[in-house]
Amino acid sequence: MTYEPDTADVAEELLHNLRGRLGTDSVDYAEPPERIHGGFDNFIYAFSLSAAPLRFSGRLILRLYRPDTDPRQACFESAIQNVLAGAGYPSPPVLLVGRSGDGLGLPFVVMPMVPGRLMLDTMWGPTAIRMAVTLAKTQIDLHAIDPEPVRRALARAGCPSHVLAVERDLWEMEREIERAGLVGLRPGARWLGDNRPPPVEDTVVCHGDFHPLNVLVDEGRVSGVIDWSARRVRLGDPAYDVGATAAILAHGPVDVPDLLAGPINLGRRCFVALYRRAYLRDRPLDRDRIRYYEALRSLVFLVEAGAARQAAAGVIPPIFKRTAFGDERTVRGVVQRFHAITGETPRIPDAGRGA
């Protein structure tokens, strides 16, 4: 099941909201909202205004959250992005926050458009080597930021501390396995529960979804890190962030013919190795902890794919958010990697058939 808002309706309601919030009816569109690529958890529109205050000059982005998104996400994103931007990190500041009752029917944020291109679009040939190092360095810079101002800002935004714990992934995954009847994933979840690493004192800000689709590059330099999701941001072990990134880099969807799958996967493995080496060279971490968190995120992928198949089969209610990990080739790769780390072989329902 998918939900798609009407762009004309979004434009009308957004302008009405902006005029009310900015206190003037003279504000109008220089460029009306246009849907742009990206966003698994939200709908993204680019637009610009005329006769608006200076901070609303230039091209702007509207992120309109999907109906099943945590209603606190807009406030969460505003809090963390503004703190990080204030600390000098390339996170776009949020200019305006809207709740579901503010006219558009769904929570939203407005922020400046980040210049540049997605890092993924620049990763060809020798540039890929440089981008692997750049990705690692940008993540290291994030992990060097004092997490306490972030914790305080998120607490003011209504985000309790347990929501930011890295253990939350395991709790939510176990609950979703039972809700969706994914019995073939129970042994893997049990292994993760039995082999949790001990707590660390080195608490950092973890993006949780740090990969080349969430990093923008302008003239070879990082211009923005986006998509600070309440589902994924954590304050905890830096190995959590590195392991999650390794899993995403290895298994994120790439739509290529079967003939090219082998060479593409080889290139991905090389990129992951370069990224991991660059990170550990400048900020050493326990490799076993990284592998554990890579396995954790890998099982999260399988839970997401399995739940999508159960929903498609009518076993559980429809899911608004599409999965990026549901095709057979991706599932096979994730299962193989999880087995290599844990010795367990998780299983999800076949596509087109419920459990």
Where do the model's predicted regions map?
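Catalytic-loop of the protein kinase fold
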Residues: 205-207, 212
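Activation of the activation-loop gatekeeper triad in protein kinase-fold domains
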Residues: 226-231
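Active-site activation/catalytic loop segments of kinase-like enzymes and analogous catalytic loops
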Residues: 240-283, 297-315
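Conserved active-site segments centered on acidic
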Residues: 222
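Helical subdomain adjoining the active site within ATP-dependent kinase catalytic cores
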Residues: 285-289, 300-355
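ATP-binding pocket architecture of kinase catalytic cores
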Residues: 32-165, 172-187, 196-202
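Juxta-kinase regulatory segment immediately upstream of eukaryotic protein kinase catalytic domains
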Residues: 1-29
